[in-house]
């Protein structure tokens, strides 16, 4: 019995020691990894990946038009965001898992999109807002609840999970079969891309998060959202990466320009935000509130996490 207990303790200690050694956080593994990847063709830092965290939320209000200045909500790095960052940093240090993911991605990219590969591996989760940031934007309290949420292009459902406590029924759409599998595991009702507009009922909140720049007909999508949104109390929460670079991902990871082009003008974040009220007006919406947030993605063996600049809007129908 003592021998068995001793063997068990030794095994657990060995596993713990191996994890400590073979993590990208340990000096030994960092050194080995740098030696393996240094030289021409080594990994480059992700665009924006090393920005100071406070810069993610900075907006020059003086560059906003007067109507937008009145509805801007200042956001900050909060606990929910920091938890995501900490978890992402930890995951990026799991050397063997990251090597496995890299190998699978290289092989499967020949016939699968990057999104589908991420869904298969259960990696690459996105983060748009924390529960507190979501509540502040919609001006709701933690106990607020309404009937139906529709999350368009929901991915693996991790962002849906942040919104879900406020809704009795949760619907989602997604093109990727592996992401649909992830959504179904979370017990969300997945609707087809041509089904959500024809259910016969309306939605109280529709989220369209970082989808307009990755769909073929963004203006048509906005108009379809307007047609199924509850007309009085219904709201849309919409996130858009700025500067705006619209492309559609096809199988094999190929990118093509969309058939519909949104008229978004300007060179920087504030200038492009100023052109969006007219874009939304054409689809039947006005901006009720908006903020600047980082659009975060879990990292890999090259970077702890990836980040883009998001403008997140609450739209109401007119």
Curated annotation (Swiss-Prot):
The keyword Mitochondrion applies. Protein-histidine N-methyltransferase that specifically catalyzes 1-methylhistidine (pros-methylhistidine) methylation of target proteins. Specifically methylates the second His of proteins with a His-x-His (HxH) motif (where 'x' is preferably a small amino acid), while exploiting the first one as a recognition signature. Catalyzes methylation of target proteins such as S100A9, NDUFB3, SLC39A5, SLC39A7, ARMC6 and DNAJB12; 1-methylhistidine modification may affect the binding of zinc and other metals to its target proteins. Glycans are attached at residue 35. Residues 1-18 form the signal peptide. GO terms for molecular function: protein-L-histidine N-pros-methyltransferase activity. Its main location: endoplasmic reticulum. Changing residue 249 to A: Abolished binding to substrate proteins. PANTHER family: DREV PROTEIN, PROTEIN-L-HISTIDINE N-PROS-METHYLTRANSFERASE. Belongs to the METTL9 family. S-adenosyl-L-homocysteine binds at residues 174, 210, 295. This is Protein-L-histidine N-pros-methyltransferase. InterPro entries: METL9, SAM-dependent_MTases_sf. It is an enzyme of class 2 (transferase). One of its GO terms (biological process) is methylation. It catalyses: L-histidyl-[protein] + S-adenosyl-L-methionine = N(pros)-methyl-L-histidyl-[protein] + S-adenosyl-L-homocysteine + H(+). Changing residue 123 to A: Abolished binding to substrate proteins. Its EC number is 2.1.1.-. The keyword Transit peptide does not apply. It is found in: Endoplasmic reticulum; Mitochondrion. Keywords: Endoplasmic reticulum, Glycoprotein, Methyltransferase, Mitochondrion, Signal, Transferase. GO terms for cellular component: endoplasmic reticulum; mitochondrion.
